[in-house]
Amino acid sequence: MKKILILSLFFFSILHPQIRAETVYDLLISGEREKGITILRDLAENDNNKDAMYVLGLLYNDASSIDLCSTEDFCLGQNFSNYKEAKKIFTQLYQNHNDPRAAYALAEYYDDHWYFSSNYKKAFKYYLFSAERGVPEAQFNVANMYEHGDGVKKDLTQSVRWYLQCNNTSLCGAGVDGIDDLIDQLTGEQYELAKSLVVNDMKEVDIRITTARQVVSQ
């Protein structure tokens, strides 16, 4: 399936050492990861901070690729990210806060993830929840799954609808040119229905690690 799987795309850069770390993101990318992680845990466990919980889940998910295996319990053994803990955090965030970012993360775990067993029906469920709440990557994946009938009954009207929805975002934005072959397979009535289902004022939700910029460090 040609879907967008980006949960593990997490890169650290280096801040100038004299720049004051005002957010957890600053701490994470400036070499003060332990301090940043301590703040994240405190906010997640004591303040029920959704952003802190989400970023903590990302750190567990990407631990092996960002050199966190020597830190606390971020890895299983020496080389593998602690996906179990990441999934636990995302599940709590989804169940307790209806967080669309967490739903997207869970969808990826069921969508051809090497550590967890694939379950396209569950993947579609979480992608759809996320897509309906503004995550562009999920909107693209839902469109793709409707197009190919993966985890859901094939429905080209719904596929076009979700591709069009994603086209309203910074992720897609290619217009109808990329899906004209699908549109050609619809009747005029079906195409009008697909367009009518698009929510033009849907707020875009960012699932990247830069969410940590919203978490103040002090």
Language model regions located:
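Alpha-helical adaptor scaffolds
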Residues: 76-79, 83, 91-135
